Design a protein with these regions (language model features):
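Conserved, single-site charged/polar hotspot
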Residues: 4-7, 11, 17-442
Length: 442
C-alpha cells in the first residue's frame, strides 16, 4: 500500500485517541445474501461465536466468503470451508487496519475497526462495524456533504457529533448504536479525504447545546430554498432552537430550484380522492391552481404540505403552483431540497465561501444555541501518533517533499502540527489563529 493512505489512517488514529467506540449496522437498507471480505491494511483475527479462533493475522491476499445457512453464518477462507457459526467477528490487531466489504451485486466499501457478522431474523447477513466514535463521525461527514473547504466539514462534524451523542441508543434494542442509512446518518465508507479528517479534528470535543446546556437535535437538509422551516411545521414538537430564518445563502446552489409538471386532472383528483375536497368549489379550485409561497406556508386548502411532498415525492414543501389552462397542465415550481428544518448544507457551503465563521453559521441555523467545548477532554496529538508519523518520515523522505501540490501542502500542515504538539501546545479549536492556520482548500 502507498504511503499516503497509511498516513491518512494515522491521521484518523489521531482523531480517535480518546474516543469511545460505537457499533454501526452496515448496508442497513440492503439485503445481503453473500459477501466477500478482504484486507486492505493490517491484519485481523477471525473469531467464531466470540471464543473460537478460526484464523490469526489474516492480511492482504486473503479472502473470506460469508453467506447465511439457516440461522448460521457459513465461513470459507480462500475457498476452504471452515464451518458455520452463530456469529463471526473480524478483530483488528492494530489501529491501522482496513477491511474491504464486497457484497454480491452491491458496490464494495472499506471500513476501519472490527466487524461482527450474524444472521438476522429475515435469514440474511447482518454486518456491524465496531469502530472508534470519531472515525465514524469522519465517515459520516464524507457521506453527508460535498465541498472543498475545511470549515464546511467542521460544521458538519459538529452537528453530526451532536446528533450521534444525543441519539447514541437509537438502535440499542437491535444490539447496535446506529444504522448507516439516512434513518440515522449516512456512513457509506471510511473517510479517505484528508481535508475532511482535518475538519473533523478541528471540531474535536465540540457539540451544540441549548441554554440549559443540553444537547440539541441537529436536523439538516440539502437546501432551504431561501428560508428554513419551523420544527412544528414539519414534525410535532416546537423547539426554540429550530425556528424559521431567512436563508439567502441557499440561493443559486445545486439544489436551489426544482420543477415538477403534472396534468391538471392528476393534481385536482389527488385532492378530491385523497383529501375529499370539493374541487368544483370555486374558492378551493382557485387556491389549488394559484397557490404561492413568498414565505413558507404549512398547508394548502388545509392539506399539510408535508403530506403532498411525500405523496408526489417532491424535493421540498416550498413550491408555487403555475396553471396553464390551455394545456390543462400544472407546474410545481419549487425551492430547496429536504425538510427545511435546521441547517442548510448548501447554505453552509456558500457561507464558508464568503468567509463566515463556523460558529456564526451554526448560530444562524440553530436559534439561540451555543457551541460547547469539552474542556475535560481537550484534543491533543498523542505521543504514539507522533512516533508513527516520524517513523514514516524517516522511512520515506519523499513523503515530506514540499511541492506546490495541495496533497504535499496538507502533509506539511500535519508535520507542523506534530511540531506544535512536541512543544506541548494544546490545540484549542476556539483559537482564531489556529483556525486560520488550519484553513485548507482541497
Amino acid at each position: 500500500m502507498k504511503r499516503l493512505p497509511l498516513i491518512l489512517l494515522l491521521l484518523t488514529t489521531a482523531l480517535t485517541a480518546s474516543a469511545d467506540r460505537v457499533k454501526v449496522r452496515l448496508f442497513a437498507n440492503h439485503t445481503i445474501d453473500r459477501i466477500y471480505i478482504s484486507f486492505d491494511l493490517g491484519t485481523y483475527d477471525l473469531i467464531a461465536d466470540d471464543t473460537t479462533n478460526l484464523a490469526s493475522a489474516m492480511g492482504e491476499g486473503k479472502s473470506v466468503e460469508l453467506y447465511p445457512d439457516g440461522k448460521y453464518v457459513h465461513v470459507a477462507v480462500d475457498g476452504l470451508t471452515y464451518g458455520r457459526f452463530k456469529s463471526v467477528s473480524f478483530l483488528a490487531n492494530d489501529t491501522a487496519c482496513i477491511l474491504c466489504l464486497n457484497p454480491y451485486n452491491i458496490k464494495n466499501r472499506t471500513y476501519e475497526g472490527n466487524l461482527i457478522v450474524t444472521v438476522n431474523k429475515g435469514g440474511k447477513l447482518q454486518l456491524v462495524n465496531d469502530v472508534e466514535f470519531e472515525t465514524y463521525i469522519a465517515g459520516v461527514v464524507q457521506s453527508e456533504i460535498y465541498g472543498d473547504q475545511t470549515d464546511i466539514f467542521r460544521v458538519q462534524a459538529i452537528i453530526s457529533r451532536t446528533w450521534a451523542l444525543r441519539n447514541i441508543n437509537k438502535h440499542k434494542a437491535e444490539g447496535y448504536n446506529f444504522c448507516d442509512h439516512v434513518h440515522c446518518q449516512a456512513y457509506l465508507n471510511r473517510c479517505v479525504r484528508p481535508d475532511i479528517m482535518l475538519g473533523t479534528i478541528q471540531s474535536s470535543g465540540q457539540t451544540i447545546v441549548d441554554s440549559a446546556g443540553n444537547l440539541i437535535e441537529t436536523p439538516f437538509h440539502s437546501n432551504s430554498g431561501g428560508e428554513t422551516a419551523n420544527s412544528e411545521d414539519v414534525w410535532r414538537s416546537a423547539l426554540p432552537y429550530l425556528r424559521s430564518v431567512p436563508d439567502t445563502f441557499s440561493y443559486h446552489m445545486r439544489q436551489s430550484e426544482w420543477v415538477k409538471v403534472l396534468s391538471e386532472e392528476k393534481w385536482m383528483n389527488y385532492f378530491a380522492n385523497r383529501h375529499h375536497l370539493d374541487i368544483h368549489d370555486d374558492s378551493i379550485r382557485h387556491e389549488l391552481l394559484t397557490f404561492t409561497q413568498s414565505s413558507r406556508k404549512v398547508r394548502i386548502c388545509d392539506v399539510p404540505l408535508t403530506r403532498i411532498r411525500n405523496d408526489f415525492q417532491l424535493k421540498s414543501t416550498f413550491f408555487n403552483v403555475l396553471y396553464d389552462s390551455a394545456a390543462h397542465r400544472v407546474t410545481l415550481s419549487g425551492h430547496g431540497y429536504g425538510h427545511g428544518v435546521g441547517l442548510s448544507q448548501e447554505g453552509t457551503i456558500r457561507m464558508v465561501g464568503l468567509g463566515i465563521s463556523y460558529d456564526s453559521i451554526i448560530r444562524h441555523y440553530y436559534t439561540g444555541a451555543q457551541i460547547q467545548y469539552d474542556t475535560e477532554h481537550p484534543h491533543t496529538y498523542v505521543e504514539n501518533y507522533i512516533q508513527q508519523i516520524t517513523r514514516i518520515i524517516e522511512e520515506d523522505k519523499n513523503a515530506v517533499t514540499r511541492t506546490k501540490s495541495k496533497k504535499d501542502d496538507w502533509l506539511g500542515r500535519l508535520f507542523r502540527l506534530r511540531d506544535r504538539e512536541e512543544r506541548e501546545e494544546v490545540y484549542d479549536p476556539n483559537n482564531a489563529d489556529l483556525d486560520t492556520d488550519w484553513q485548507y482548500d482541497w
